[in-house]
């Protein structure tokens, strides 16, 4: 699987602000709400979920 420039940009954003990376990848939906909740509960789970979403789709 090759990474594009936009994927790398989304990964950097996911490390800084996880919900923003998920929003750019999947839009406003259940994945975004889950990521916001995970980020509120703990920053690291939010990052892990964001990276999973970006790398999966």
UniProtKB/Swiss-Prot annotation:
It is a multi-pass membrane protein. Keywords: Cell membrane, Membrane, Transmembrane, Transmembrane helix. GO terms for cellular component: plasma membrane. It holds the Pfam family Pmp3. The keyword Transmembrane helix applies. It is found in: Cell membrane. The keyword Hydrolase does not apply. InterPro entries: PMP3. The chain crosses the membrane at residues 3-23, 34-54. Plays a role in the regulation of membrane potential. Could mediate a proton leak. Belongs to the UPF0057 (PMP3) family. This is Plasma membrane proteolipid 3. It comes from Cryptococcus neoformans var. neoformans serotype D (strain JEC21 / ATCC MYA-565) (Filobasidiella neoformans).
